[in-house]
């Protein structure tokens, strides 16, 4: 009789424990992916501080009008996206998996917040970049300095120095 009660208890409550275990694992996987992306962003920021423009880049930029500098944050954004691409792809995969399999409210809230922070895009700066003349666009896209994250304010200060 005791064995039957124990077996009945296991059959009734084991699925709840298993579901909680899976939910905990999904939440942990999601947190790990977010942390990995955060670490990569910090690494890319360090790259930005170490990335210094060449003299030819500075002299090229000195001849440009002030309106040209409004596209530099967008160019830096593109470089940061390139730098963090693998981690964002991994996070997107984990988000998709957890989103379709999770029912816990805290996990769902974490998913929504992470999606907003990580994958929201402002296209207004892209318009300014696309409106550049072909020579300027080609220079930026082919220049090694702009292919890595960089300090936008530091670059502007170097260009405006006399």
Predicted regions and their residues:
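Mature extracytoplasmic domains of secretory-pathway proteins
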Residues: 66-117
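Immediate post-signal-peptide N-terminus of mature secreted/exported proteins
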Residues: 19-66
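Residues that cap or delimit alpha-helices
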Residues: 65, 72-73, 133, 144
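Classical Sec-dependent N-terminal signal peptides that target proteins to the secretory pathway
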Residues: 1-21
């Amino acid at each position: 009789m005791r064995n039957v009660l124990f077996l009945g208890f296991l059959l009734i409550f084991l699925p709840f424990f298993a579901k909680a275990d899976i939910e905990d694992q999904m939440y942990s996987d999601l947190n790990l992916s977010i942390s990995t992306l955060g670490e990569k962003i910090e690494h890319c920021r360090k790259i930005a501080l170490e990335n210094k423009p060449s003299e030819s880049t500075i002299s090229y930029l000195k001849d440009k009008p002030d309106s040209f500098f409004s596209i530099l944050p967008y160019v830096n954004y593109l470089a940061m996206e390139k730098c963090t691409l693998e981690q964002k792809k991994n996070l997107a995969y984990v988000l998709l998996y957890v989103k379709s399999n999770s029912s816990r409210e805290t996990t769902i809230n974490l998913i929504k917040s992470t999606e907003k922070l990580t994958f929201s895009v402002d296209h207004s700066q892209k318009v300014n970049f696309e409106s550049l003349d072909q020579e300027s666009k080609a220079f930026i896209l082919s220049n090694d300095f702009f292919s890595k994250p960089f300090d936008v304010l530091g670059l502007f200060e170097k260009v405006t120095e006399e």
